Amino acid sequence: MAVCARLCGVGPARGCRRRQQRRGPAETAAADSEADTDPEEERIEAGPARCSLLELPPELLVEIFASLPGTDLPSLAQVCSRFRRILHTDTIWRRRCREEYGVCENLRKLEITGVSCRDVYAKLLHRYRHILGLWQPDIGPYGGLLNVVVDGLFIIGWMYLPPHDPHVGDPMRFKPLFRIHLMERKSATVECMYGHKGPHNGHIQIVKRDEFSTKCNQTDHHRMSGGRQEEFRTWLREEWGRTLEDIFHEHMQELILMKFIYTSQYDNCLTYRRIYLPPSHPDDLIKPGLFKGTYGSHGLEIVMLSFHGSRARGTKITGDPNIPAGQQTVEIDLQRRIQLPDVENLRNFNELSRIVLEVREQVRQEQEAGEGAAPPREPSAKAADGPPAKDGKEPGGGAEAAEQSASSGQGQPFVLPVGVSSRNEDYPRTCRLCFYGTGLIAGHGFTSPERTPGVFVLFDEDRFGFLWLELKSFSLYSRVQATFQNAAAPSPQAFDEMLRNIQSLTS
């Protein structure tokens, strides 16, 4: 009865309301006069009183509050004045800065400037949390890769640049474009880092969750005493690692000068759109991600490799006037394995061309018959390690030996055919697998774009190549080894939508 009384909100002496409703007046009076002597109910009634959070010692409340997400703490402060006072304890906010944003600096030095850890969390980290991660600037066809990170007591936007052409295996370069901090005042300070005269006044506007813009308020800091010529020479040395006199190819000189004129006009006043790293699956051919690739006279560019069922795609993160950033530069059909001939025959461009064009003809026939409209998702890329797909010719002689070598894990000898140009001659001489693919080519200004056949060459987990048949050119790609935080797509659908969005901007 005591348990029922608790649920009904009355004491045991008065009994259960529901039972009283079923009794008559005489029964109710008799029941009220009886003593409730059930020992089990007595033990329940005599249980310990509940403890309120308000009765806990302050140091325990600090520990509890510090373990909660920082976004929940403002609501907690509205409960009572005691909670509000405790939430001013810097220990709580120091832990939230460390656990949520990785700030491992000794935040005690902030006391000198009168800035608390609570200020750092609320006015810097939380306020600008939406700009952390990877972004692509809107710089016409050139694009770019910006990584916004928490760096100590700063939020810094680092522009990632490919290594100097043609050293595709070298690490990425990076330079700061802006920073935000609270070191000198209690409101966040945005500074432009562009140019060579040090930090100066800037502004950041968060347009929406996946878009923000930067503005420099002192563009005179970007100018150099020697005028545009000095600015160009400095930019060329940073961008290409050489002088204009070192570049003998006239067309390449024109492309370089065009890029300088186009990009310098923005003066670090840019709009950025969020990009995600591609999701990874166990059956992917290799780990997807960002790669540096050689693109002839355009130098090195950044490409994102992603897997979509039976196909792999390379999307440009940086671009050029022919194929702008955001476009799909290569597409690989993982169901159409190409067996290369032996090394001697591989040197013959016509032999390789014959093999690739036979596969293209097979693709065309299947598309006309309606069979290639919706290719099945299986077998997966990993399954391609088995026998090669039918390519119109049965491999024989040296090709069989090469196939056995590749399937045994030793790899297959690889050499570029005579007449095929490559910006980097230091490519691997052994490959694991080859697939049929297409590459996107176009005229200046992205005119008359078309997809042309080629060969995707997988060397290892971190390197692949693409042989452009029509251009008689070879692009070598090397993985970007940097680690990026806050760059994972919330879902595969969000990643696909991101690809569509950046492609539509330059289509």
UniProtKB/Swiss-Prot annotation:
InterPro entries the UniProt entry points to: F-box-like_dom_sf (IPR036047), F-box_dom (IPR001810), FBXO31/39 (IPR045048)
Motif range (DDL motif): 283-285
PTM summary: Phosphorylation at Ser-264 by ATM following gamma-irradiation results in its stabilization. Phosphorylation at Ser-448 in absence of stress promotes its ubiquitination and degradation by the SCF(FBXO46) complex. Phosphorylation at Ser-33 by AKT1 promotes association with CDC20 and ubiquitination by the APC/C complex.
Superkingdom of origin organism: Eukaryota
Chain residue ranges for the region called Disordered: 19-42, 366-417
GO CC aspect terms: cytoplasm; neuronal cell body; SCF ubiquitin ligase complex
Disulphide bridges: none
Listed Acidic residues bias regions: 33-42
GO biological process per UniProt: anaphase-promoting complex-dependent catabolic process; cellular response to oxidative stress; DNA damage response; mitotic G1 DNA damage checkpoint signaling; proteasome-mediated ubiquitin-dependent protein catabolic process; protein ubiquitination; SCF-dependent proteasomal ubiquitin-dependent protein catabolic process
Keyword Zinc-finger: no
Compartment(s) of residence: Cytoplasm; Cytoplasm, Cytoskeleton, Microtubule organizing center, Centrosome
Leader sequence residues: none
Keyword Transferase appears in the UniProt entry: no
Domain F-box: 50-96
Binding annotation for Zn(2+): 192, 200, 216, 222
Main location group: cytoplasm
Pfam families noted in UniProt: Cyclin_D1_bind, F-box-like
Biological pathway: Protein modification; protein ubiquitination
Function: Substrate-recognition component of the SCF(FBXO31) protein ligase complex, which specifically mediates the ubiquitination of proteins amidated at their C-terminus in response to oxidative stress, leading to their degradation by the proteasome. FBXO31 specifically recognizes and binds C-terminal peptides bearing an amide: C-terminal amidation in response to oxidative stress takes place following protein fragmentation.
Domain remarks in the Swiss-Prot or TrEMBL record: Zinc-binding is required for the structure of the protein and facilitate folding.
Subunit: Part of a SCF (SKP1-cullin-F-box) protein ligase complex SCF(FBXO31) composed of CUL1, SKP1, RBX1 and FBXO31. Interacts (when phosphorylated at Ser-33) with CDC20, promoting ubiquitination by the APC/C complex.
Name assigned to this protein: F-box only protein 31
Species in which this protein is naturally found: Mus musculus (Mouse)
